[in-house]
A protein has these predicted regions:
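Alpha-helical transmembrane segments of multi-pass membrane proteins
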Residues: 66-81, 109-135, 159-173
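Intrinsically disordered, low-complexity non-transmembrane regions of multi-pass membrane transporters
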Residues: 102-123, 184-200
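Juxtamembrane and boundary regions of transmembrane helices in multi-pass small-molecule transporters
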Residues: 89, 151-200
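Hydrophobic transmembrane alpha-helices of multi-pass solute/ion transporters
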Residues: 1-39, 43, 52-56, 200
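Hydrophobic core segments of alpha-helical transmembrane domains in multi-pass membrane transport
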Residues: 2-9, 37-41, 72-80, 146-150, ...
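Short helix-coil transition sites and intra-membrane helix breaks within transmembrane domains
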Residues: 29-30, 42-51, 81-98, 133-142
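Membrane-interfacial helix-loop connectors
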Residues: 90-115, 124, 142-162
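Hydrophobic alpha-helical transmembrane segments of multi-pass integral membrane proteins
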Residues: 60-105
Length: 200
């Protein structure tokens, strides 16, 4: 009602209102996709997504929480190179990766320490950010690559998107390796701290 009244009093009319609404939707479709992902994630969580992810990983006794974060990082980097988004921290890390990481601890008969859980949230979120940040520039024509290209052009460097992607490959691989090693070692240290003598 408020939309129609505002359009009519503003002089747009019904046709102008519908045109503006359609144009705004098309121009902001990324936001619409974000909202749809959040709704789908919420629905799946309510119907047992977290529990399914945790029970799946409990079958693998040798896997650690750090390994889950690292494996996710590898897949995230590969998909980021093709500009495929998983929904970020809220859409994928929180409902799927975190329960899997916590499931590795529970599979060893341990109760997850609250501080360890918070650390794992940070590690998984950081891995998402590192891999998305460095991986999206590998996609030729992606927003990240275009931003870097335009910034370099303003600084006097004329580079093609292909050249930029080639230069970015070793940078992305290095970022992934450094992050993976860091999170793996950090998680091992945290496991010893929070579960001493438990073989975690």
């Amino acid at each position: 009602v408020a939309l129609v009244v505002t359009a009519l009093t503003g002089g747009l009319g019904i046709q102008g209102m519908l045109e503006l609404l359609g144009t705004s939707f098309v121009n902001n479709r990324g936001m619409a996709i974000f909202i749809i992902i959040m709704l789908a994630t919420g629905t799946l969580e309510r119907n047992g997504l977290k529990e399914s992810a945790a029970s799946l990983i409990k079958r693998f006794k040798k896997v650690s929480a750090g390994m889950i974060v690292d494996i996710y990082g590898i897949f995230r980097m590969i998909f980021a190179a093709f500009n495929v988004s998983f929904g970020g921290v809220a859409g994928f890390v929180r409902p799927i990766i975190l329960p899997m990481a916590l499931g590795t601890i529970e599979s060893k008969g341990l109760e997850v320490h609250p501080k360890h859980e918070e650390e794992l949230k940070g590690m998984a979120s950081a891995m998402e950010n590192v891999c998305w940040f460095f991986g999206q520039v590998l996609f030729i024509g992606g927003a990240g690559a275009l931003l870097v290209q335009s910034t370099l052009k303003d600084l006097g460097y004329d580079v093609t998107l292909g050249q930029l992607a080639l230069v970015e490959v070793p940078v992305a691989i290095t970022a992934l390796v450094v992050a993976s090693v860091y999170f793996y070692l950090k998680e091992k240290k945290l496991a010893k701290k929070y579960y001493p003598g438990k073989g975690q």
